[in-house]
Curated annotation (Swiss-Prot):
NDH-1 shuttles electrons from NADH, via FMN and iron-sulfur (Fe-S) centers, to quinones in the respiratory chain. The immediate electron acceptor for the enzyme in this species is believed to be ubiquinone. Couples the redox reaction to proton translocation (for every two electrons transferred, four hydrogen ions are translocated across the cytoplasmic membrane), and thus conserves the redox energy in a proton gradient. This subunit may bind ubiquinone. Keywords: Cell inner membrane, Cell membrane, Membrane, NAD, Quinone, Translocase, Transmembrane, Transmembrane helix, Ubiquinone. This is NADH-quinone oxidoreductase subunit H. InterPro entries: NADH_UbQ_OxRdtase_su1/FPO, NADH_UbQ_OxRdtase_su1_CS. It is a multi-pass membrane protein. It comes from Xylella fastidiosa (strain Temecula1 / ATCC 700964).
């Protein structure tokens, strides 16, 4: 178990419980803030990292001012906050405002069941996988409402594209997670991680036996977040900004925040489901206690999870800088004719591997 959790968080939890029901409520609010605030800050620095990384790929410098580029995202946030929120004359104002909130709320609520280390999770729900599928499916309703309430042909076309794309790839993602559930024997995300523990390091991870499902989930995750090369929802050369074309100021920033929060979420989930979460790739190869500062290298811990997340978050940026946008019909064909049949076949293969003992559950 994480030493930091035992020494700091657990005594703090017990102190809050001493205040009875009020303490339970305050502890829950504190845990929510401990996830929400770092997530918002992470989105800000993720935007800076995206601009710098794309700049390097284009042989440019990227952001260089406002704290040498480090605080450029915060400057952009303040700029958006002070901009006027304009409402189209024929828009449905109530739904126009609710839509970005409906998109943002599920992207934050999904983090409730995401574990960062052993017991370091807001809600260690036994049906965490189902909860995640439900939350990640709700965001599209905000996009549809935004397209409809804007009373714009461009916005409505982007919303319809988003609805079809999310429905298409949500099925493939769900089937991919069925394979993970079969291999782990649990819907609890912490137990899914521990099912990949063992003495063989990364050879015990689900990445190897479930590699086709890993590819399907990763590509579907990119499509779910409407990122390049699946960004037909907001294709600049076709429909300007899609469902966001009529938004400005702070309400536009909410869509922006939801998109990047979802990108970070998908990076976390793919690390948890297929790459052992916080487990070390050399776990079981080396043992012993040297120093708490370096023991995580072979024993595992949240730094490993963050390193894996950083890799996938950077891959999002690489996709944007490298690949051209797919046509709408190509995206639909990939989802329905390739990914869904592939996941169905590999679910059966996974069941056979579990039955025959090829996939062994960890500790």
């Amino acid at each position: 178990m994480n030493t930091w959790f035992l020494n700091v968080v657990d005594p703090l939890h017990q102190w809050f419980l001493g205040f009875g029901d009020i303490g339970v409520v305050l502890w829950t609010v504190l845990k929510i803030l401990m996830i929400a605030i770092p997530l918002i800050v992470s989105v800000a620095f993720y935007v800076v990292w995206e601009r710098k990384l794309i700049g390097w790929m284009h042989v440019r410098h990227g952001p260089m001012y406002v704290g040498m580029g480090l605080f450029q995202a915060f400057a952009d946030v303040f700029k958006l906050l002070f901009k006027e929120v304009l409402y189209p004359s024929k828009a449905h104002k109530a739904i126009f405002v609710i839509a970005p909130l409906l998109t943002l709320a599920p992207s934050f609520a999904a983090w409730a069941v995401v574990p960062f280390d052993t017991k370091l999770v807001l809600s260690n729900a036994n049906v965490g996988l189902l909860y995640l599928l439900a939350m990640t499916s709700l965001g599209v309703y905000g996009i549809i409402l935004a397209g409809w309430a804007s009373n714009s042909k461009y916005a409505f076309l982007g919303a319809m594209r988003s609805a079809a794309q999310v429905v298409s790839y949500e099925i493939a993602m769900g089937f991919a997670l069925v394979g993970v559930m079969i291999a782990a024997g649990s819907l609890n995300l912490s137990q899914i991680v521990m099912a990949q523990a063992g003495s063989s390091g990364f050879f015990d991870w689900f990445l190897i036996p479930l590699f086709p499902l890993f590819i399907v989930y990763w590509v579907s995750g990119v499509a779910e977040t409407n990122r390049s090369p699946f960004d037909v929802v907001e294709g600049e050369s076709e429909i300007v900004a899609g469902h966001m074309v009529e938004y400005s100021g702070s309400v536009f920033a909410l869509f922006f925040l939801a998109e990047y929060a979802n990108m970070i979420l998908v990076s976390f989930l793919i690390s948890i489901f297929f790459l052992g979460g916080w487990l070390s790739p050399i776990q079981g190869w080396v043992s012993g206690q040297v120093s708490p500062l370096i023991d995580w290298v072979w024993n595992g811990g949240w730094p490993w999870l963050l390193l894996k997340v950083l890799f996938f978050a950077s891959a999002y940026i690489w996709f944007r800088a490298s690949f051209p946008r797919y046509r709408y019909d190509q995206i639909m064909r990939l989802g329905w004719k390739v990914f869904i049949p592939l996941t169905i076949v590999w679910i059966a293969v996974t069941a056979l591997m579990v039955f025959s003992g090829v996939i062994q559950k960890g500790v």
